[in-house]
A protein has these predicted regions:
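Amphipathic, small/basic residue-rich leader segments at the start of a protein or domain
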Residues: 1-67, 74, 78, 83-94, ...
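Short beta-alpha junctions and helix-cap segments that line functional grooves
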Residues: 88, 134, 178-182
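Short Gly/Pro-enriched turn/cap motifs at secondary-structure boundaries
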Residues: 107-111, 137-142, 155-157, 183-190
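Short beta-strand-initiation
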Residues: 113-116, 144, 161-163, 189-191
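Flexible, small-/acidic-enriched active-site or ligand-binding loops
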Residues: 115, 173-192
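A structural signal for short hydrophobic beta-strand segments in well-ordered beta-sheet cores
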Residues: 118-121
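A short core secondary-structure module
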Residues: 125-126, 130-176
Length: 192
């Protein structure tokens, strides 16, 4: 077990070996109901497998079924264009990279997205994002390469139609991790 700041640059070495075994046994990407990308299981069928995976802290990652990657892959599979799927979904589906999801903000009850303050404004063919997030699931993992950032893009719309999820590489200029948060004394390294 690594200690101190080194905990953020390390993940269990056995994971890669277990991933290869899971792929060989057909125990890979079980969460995606779309058979083109996943195993084609219903949520009910997957629930039984998720319950079993929950008995080990590394099983879901070893089978490429851990959050926030699962939700992020579902979003990109369902709403991403061909370029998004080629650049981000395929490496996620292969288990080559990890992802992060950024919604929670300081000073707001971020489980209610209508409170969100972060914004994204279209500038030409790119979005300029402004805002601070308080907790970004997965951002601490050294393999994290893509971020889904939830923000307000249509401030004049009704409160439940104001938001978008923006894909951004973690290495984008301006993306900065200031500190890893502790919740009930835990920081969930290296995942965060």
């Amino acid at each position: 077990i690594k200690v101190g700041s080194e905990r953020w640059n390390h993940y269990p070495e056995i994971i890669d070996e277990l991933k290869n075994k899971a792929k060989a046994e057909g125990l890979w990407n079980l969460f995606l109901p779309e058979s083109e990308f996943g195993a084609g299981l219903s949520n009910y069928e997957y629930a039984h497998l998720a319950e079993e995976m929950g008995k080990s802290h590394i099983a879901s990652e070893a089978m490429n079924c851990s959050a926030p990657d699962t939700g992020n892959m579902e979003v990109i599979a369902r709403y991403g264009n061909d370029s998004h799927q080629e650049e981000w979904l395929k490496p996620l589906l292969n288990g080559d990279i990890r992802s992060a999801f950024s919604m929670t903000e300081p000073g707001t009850a971020s489980s209610d997205a209508t409170n969100m303050q972060a914004t994204a404004v279209l500038d030409g063919d790119e979005y300029v994002i402004n805002g601070e997030k308080w907790w970004t699931s997965g951002a601490g993992d050294p393999r994290c390469k893509i971020l889904i950032f939830m923000c307000v893009t249509n401030p004049d719309n009704p409160k439940h139609q104001r938001h978008s999820m923006i894909l951004g590489p973690m290495e984008t200029e301006g993306v900065e991790i200031k500190q890893m948060m502790h919740v009930f004394g835990y920081d969930d390294a290296p995942h965060g």
